[in-house]
Swiss-Prot record:
<feature type="propeptide">
    <location>
        <begin position="21"/>
        <end position="64"/>
    </location>
</feature>
<feature type="domain" description="Disintegrin">
    <location>
        <begin position="65"/>
        <end position="105"/>
    </location>
</feature>
<feature type="disulfide bond">
    <location>
        <begin position="65"/>
        <end position="74"/>
    </location>
</feature>
<feature type="disulfide bond">
    <location>
        <begin position="70"/>
        <end position="93"/>
    </location>
</feature>
<keyword id="KW-0800">Toxin</keyword>
<dbReference type="GO" id="GO:0001525">
    <property type="term" value="P:angiogenesis"/>
</dbReference>
<keyword id="KW-0037">Angiogenesis</keyword>
<dbReference type="GO" id="GO:0030154">
    <property type="term" value="P:cell differentiation"/>
</dbReference>
<dbReference type="InterPro" id="IPR036436">
    <property type="entry name" value="Disintegrin_dom_sf"/>
</dbReference>
<feature type="signal peptide">
    <location>
        <begin position="1"/>
        <end position="20"/>
    </location>
</feature>
<feature type="disulfide bond">
    <location>
        <begin position="71"/>
        <end position="98"/>
    </location>
</feature>
<keyword id="KW-1015">Disulfide bond</keyword>
<feature type="disulfide bond">
    <location>
        <begin position="83"/>
        <end position="100"/>
    </location>
</feature>
<comment type="subunit">
    <text>Monomer.</text>
</comment>
<feature type="short sequence motif" description="Cell attachment site; atypical (KTS)">
    <location>
        <begin position="85"/>
        <end position="87"/>
    </location>
</feature>
<comment type="function">
    <text>Specifically interacts with the alpha-1/beta-1 integrin (ITGA1/ITGB1). Exhibits highly inhibitory effects on cell adhesion and cell migration to collagens I and IV. Also shows in vivo anti-angiogenic activity.</text>
</comment>
<comment type="similarity">
    <text>Belongs to the disintegrin family. Short disintegrin subfamily.</text>
</comment>
Length: 107
């Protein structure tokens, strides 16, 4: 009786911890799902793309930046590129951020 109670408590606390399923393609996937029959398989060795590749000014696979005065075509502008100019001073991109240091739009 105690064993049955322990099993019931264990199932209540840890109802489903995931499983591995070998797909028709031969790939083994680890996942947590309620209905394993709904998983679609990929060809063996294939990787599912989550992002569209960049073409021109569209998205790239892993964009470094999307907008900002130090961003151009999803890439950071080189360090030293002028990003903001006033009559008294100029500000330059760092090459590490899409934001311009001391740019009024950052605040």
């Amino acid at each position: 009786m105690i064993q049955v109670l322990l099993v019931i408590i264990c199932l209540a606390v840890f109802p489903f911890q995931g499983s591995s399923k070998t797909l028709k393609s031969g790939n083994v996937n680890d996942y947590e799902v309620v209905n394993p029959g709904t998983v679609t398989g990929l060809p063996k060795g294939a990787v599912e793309e989550k992002h569209e590749p960049m073409k021109g000014n569209t998205l790239q696979k892993f964009p470094l930046c999307t907008t900002g005065p130090c961003c151009r075509q999803c890439k950071l502008k080189p360090a030293g590129t002028t990003c903001w100019k006033t009559s008294r001073t100029s500000h330059y991109c760092t090459g590490k951020s899409c934001d311009c240091p001391s740019y009024p739009g950052n605040g």
